[in-house]
């Protein structure tokens, strides 16, 4: 972001919020390309096309300067060559530039906030992160009873997303151009349904839509977060917070008058007074958990559905919201199957001559790797069949053996790294076995040999070197403390460099 600040004239851009000229700047597309390329190497397989170049960007900007291709006219819209030839690469470049430009006001606002208040960093900014979910699973999940498993629907039209962005971006020209681009070049069904997505709006281009979608979801989450955060102090008996509680009840009454026009909402106002509510979300999946009863969760379900449908045009289907009891059901979230299990422990006590046994049941959170969906993802990516038997992948003839092994090893290490928070690692061993044998069969297929002959000729150590997990590397580096580290790695470890869900955990993969 520092490099962008050197290019931008911050005095003018921050004063007028004028983003439209940035669309015609070459460095914007260069920054957008480099950012997506670097992130794809960290978390995905290297499959980024090398067709994009500054020469193509210059030609695209020149065409945008020479002719008014984005001008809508009912008479000549069909004759517009820029609209008629929906070039995949051109659409990809423009969408990457749009995604980068609309994020600039948010990034600059965050930087100015942190620079002006270095001592007072807003906690809500830190909590709105994927890293806040892992402590929630560790610390609070075992103390809850019921969860609302909610699949947030997409808005019915792209115009709703653009209207939401108007509160943050004051440049009308950029918004009009963004609206026109989304309506003309991007199929709305392909945006909201990944299975229908064409090559013209690939996974990298989904960043623009995800940014608009998260901005829309943030609007109603901010109101819900206010009720949740303030209600956590309602049961305090200290006289110092009595005035704050009185003001909070007044704010709730105003929210009822401003945001909610439901007749029976006044009678259900006590819903927001429950302090034991927890809300987490990642992408479209959100969870509302509480210590309350099933009746209490049903009332929250009715309230939230009515609230979202009336004021944010989010139409929920009843089958998209589930009320599950944690002791009987597993929760699928972030590529894990999380559940609360009773772990019995027997303690022998003795008082004088009498001895007796005490049975204690302690709640424990289990985070398991969903092996069946993960194998289905591997089968979809052609690493194995539907039964989990490894198969060879067709690869290009110009790829070297080390390049093939490195690609398989990257997938294996990413899966081990992401699912290190699993309480049971046996499922990961099966995934590693599938990837290792699939890699061996792919190499044997390339050399027109059998797996046994290939491994006998090159040695199995070649595969072990590239497919070694992080735990194995640590044990080899520090052999004297390996016994201690083995006990550590049997427990859950959440790595802080996990910034997005793994593709295979998301049931999507490309090689």
UniProtKB/Swiss-Prot annotation:
One Gene Ontology molecular-function label: RNA binding
Subcellular location: Plastid, Chloroplast
One example of a Gene Ontology biological process annotation: RNA splicing
Keywords: Chloroplast, mRNA processing, Plastid, RNA-binding, tRNA processing
Principal place of residence: plastid
GO cellular component, one term: chloroplast
Record InterPro entries: Domain_X, Maturase_MatK, Maturase_MatK_N
Keyword tRNA processing assigned: yes
Cleavable signal peptide: none
Keyword Membrane: no
Job of this protein: Usually encoded in the trnK tRNA gene intron. Probably assists in splicing its own and other chloroplast group II introns.
HAMAP family: MatK (MF_01390)
Family: Belongs to the intron maturase 2 family. MatK subfamily.
Protein's name according to its UniProt entry: Maturase K
Gene: matK
């Amino acid at each position: 972001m520092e490099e962008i600040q050197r290019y931008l004239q911050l005095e003018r851009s921050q004063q007028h919020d004028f983003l439209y000229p940035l669309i015609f700047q070459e460095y914007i597309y260069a920054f957008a390309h480099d950012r997506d390329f670097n992130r794809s190497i960290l978390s995905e397989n290297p499959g980024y096309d090398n067709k994009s170049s500054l020469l193509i960007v210059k030609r695209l900007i020149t065409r945008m300067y020479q002719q008014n291709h984005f001008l809508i006219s009912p008479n000549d819209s069909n004759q517009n060559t820029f609209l008629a030839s929906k070039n995949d690469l051109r659409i990809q470049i423009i969408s990457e530039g749009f995604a980068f430009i609309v994020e600039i006001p948010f990034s600059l606002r965050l930087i100015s906030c942190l620079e002006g208040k270095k001592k007072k960093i807003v906690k809500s900014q830190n909590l709105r992160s994927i890293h806040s979910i892992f402590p929630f699973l560790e610390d609070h999940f075992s103390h809850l009873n019921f969860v609302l498993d909610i699949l947030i629907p997409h808005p019915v039209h792209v115009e709703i997303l653009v209207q939401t962005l108007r509160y943050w971006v004051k440049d009308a020209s950029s918004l009009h151009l963004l609206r026109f681009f989304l309506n003309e070049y991007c199929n709305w069904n392909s945006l909201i349904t990944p299975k229908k997505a064409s090559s013209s709006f690939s996974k990298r281009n989904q960043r623009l839509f995800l940014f608009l979608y998260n901005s829309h979801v943030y609007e109603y989450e901010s109101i819900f977060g206010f009720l949740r955060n303030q209600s956590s102090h309602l049961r305090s008996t200290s006289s110092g917070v009595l005035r704050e509680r009185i003001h909070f009840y007044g704010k709730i009454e105003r929210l009822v008058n401003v945001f909610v026009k439901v007749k029976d909402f006044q009678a259900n106002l006590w819903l927001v007074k429950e302090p034991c509510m927890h809300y987490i979300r990642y992408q479209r999946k959100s969870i509302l958990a509480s210590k309350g009863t099933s009746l209490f969760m049903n009332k929250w379900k009715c309230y939230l559905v009515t609230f979202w449908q009336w004021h944010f045009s989010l139409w929920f289907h009843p089958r998209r919201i589930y009320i599950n009891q944690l002791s009987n059901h597993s929760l699928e979230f972030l590529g894990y199957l999380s559940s609360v299990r009773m772990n019995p422990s027997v303690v022998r006590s003795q008082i004088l001559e009498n001895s007796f046994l005490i049975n204690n049941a302690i709640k424990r959170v289990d985070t398991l790797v969903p092996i069946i969906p993960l194998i289905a993802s591997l089968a979809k990516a052609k690493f194995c069949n539907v039964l989990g038997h490894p198969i060879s992948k067709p690869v290009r003839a110009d790829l070297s053996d080390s390049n093939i092994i490195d690609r398989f090893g990257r997938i294996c290490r990413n899966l081990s790294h992401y699912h290190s928070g699993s309480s049971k690692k046996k499922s990961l061993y099966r995934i590693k076995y599938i990837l290792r044998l699939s890699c061996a069969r792919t190499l044997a297929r390339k050399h027109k040999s059998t797996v046994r002959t290939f491994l006998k000729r090159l040695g199995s150590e070649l595969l072990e070197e590239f497919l070694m997990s992080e735990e194995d590397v640590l044990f080899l580096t520090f052999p004297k403390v390996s016994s201690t580290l083995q006990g550590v790695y049997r427990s859950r470890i959440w790595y802080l460099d996990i910034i997005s869900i793994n593709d295979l955990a998301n049931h999507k993969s490309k090689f």
